Amino acid sequence: MCEDGDTFPADIALMTSSDDGGCFIKTSSLDGEKNLKKRIQVKGLKAYFDVTNANLKQYNGVKGHLEVEQPNKDLHTFKGTLYLDGGSKMFSFSQDQLLLKGANLANTEWVVGVVAYTGEQTKIMLNSQKGRVKMSHLEGMVNQLVIY
């Protein structure tokens, strides 16, 4: 569960929210865009996540598992399947339900989700690169001469 203004600690698949299942996220720290992005609940999940603000903290009424594709760098694709009721109910997830690590929840009181990727497997971490060591041409030549 994340609340308004929180930064997502991992890549999370959205299950429900205080805002009729959907939410807005701010990704300016990731891609520089100032516009809020809308994320929507998968159709049909609302019946499983009938949560109110009053009973949110102790909610544990849904049992199932989420299968997701192998971690990849593409920020604009995501595929996953949520299995509920012992696998008899399946719900497909896409990029419209993915809350990226490092993004912030905005204009939505709370969201509930299932962690899809953590640590080095998050899309942002897969896209991060180590900084290059920068040196001038002259410094490189001097280093070679010092070695000989």
What are these regions (language model features)?
Residues 1-148:
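Conserved cytosolic headpiece of P-type ATPases
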